[in-house]
Amino acid sequence: MNFAWDQPAPERKGRPNAFGLTPEDLESLGCPGRSQHVFSQLQRQWQWIEEHPFLSKEVRYWLEDHTDLSLPILSQALHSEDGSTKCILSLNDGELIEVVHMPREVKTSRVTLCISSQVGCAMGCTFCATGAMGIKRNLESGEIVGQVLLLMKTLGPKTPDHLTLVFMGMGEPLHNLMNVHKAIQILSHSHGLNISPKRITVSTSGLVSGIERLARMTPRPLLAISLNATTDEVRSSSMPINRAYNLSQLRHALDSWILKTNEKLTFEYVLMRGVNDSYLDAHRLSEWLGELRHQHNVNLIPMNEHRASDQKEPSRESLEIFSRTLRDLGCFVTVRKSRGRDIQAACGQLIRNL
């Protein structure tokens, strides 16, 4: 059986985006000057690139001739009552992606950015609006880094020390692993924004081959698994990827991840009314987790309804029973408070050009 994610998503051709280049890339391309210095100024002082006070004219002219110095364009910003902002960004080829800027609810300058890895998504999850788009193309590393730079410039925070990144926007990050990982290399580089990989989370629908590859890479972000079902039958009906990598194969890959990395996982579980929110589902979830339930977080996410799916959010009673049952069984449980639901910016609601 062939699946959309068996083939690489389309890539773009042309001059490399300057913000997606490492110091080694700059050196290999023949950039004049010290490549580490040029990289540092690109990442930290990008808003001044046209009249950059810390780069020579020779370097600026070389960058203009040999690279693409553009960032995504902020086409529209929708502001939620809860303080979050959905940003619709336009890319060089006219494609649109969405990013969500979420300040912490307490009085602090800390911000979480929910960023995208692809235009569309090949996974086809029935509860996710992005899946209804299909896959258009991968984002380049510079377009991923560009989301962060642009949002820092327009909405903050002013310092990357106050920033947390989650690859939970449009796309399956592990279907675009090379560009996603290169972006993480750049964002965490000590001469760049220097964002710790421990403040970067990659969420996957369960692309086992990508999980295995990511476990061998450095720097390595935190990993979240979009689980959402306790039987192969239900998971395959709502998440087609389960037909390629079933729950048993996924669990084996996660055991290997933990053995290799010794890092905690987050299990995301979107609760859908009448689909996966029963008392029996809670017991099966605890059983599937086994010993993992004591140390690894189960993050319950009430379904965020949207026009691309018929799935409904659970009742408050079923959510409370489900979470209480898991806790009684020894699971470490959190319930996500969805941000930006009033502007269609919550988990599973990001979509363009449907």
Question: What is each stretch, according to the model?
Answer:
Residues 1-94, 103, 255-263, 271-354:
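Auxiliary Fe-S-binding modules of radical SAM enzymes
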Residues 39, 99, 122, 126-129, ...:
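Short, surface-exposed helix/turn micro-motifs that flank interaction/cofactor sites
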Residues 79-80, 116-117, 203, 226:
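Short linear Ser/Thr-Pro motifs
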Residues 85, 97, 111-115, 123, ...:
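Generic beta-strand structural signal
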Residues 98-106:
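A short, surface-exposed beta-strand/turn
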Residues 105-143, 149-150:
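Canonical Radical SAM [4Fe-4S] cluster-binding loop centered on the CxxxCxxC motif
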Residues 122, 207-209, 232, 340-344:
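Alpha-helix N-cap/helix-start and coil->helix boundary motif
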Residues 152-325, 329-331:
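Conserved AdoMet/S-adenosylmethionine-binding subsite of the radical SAM
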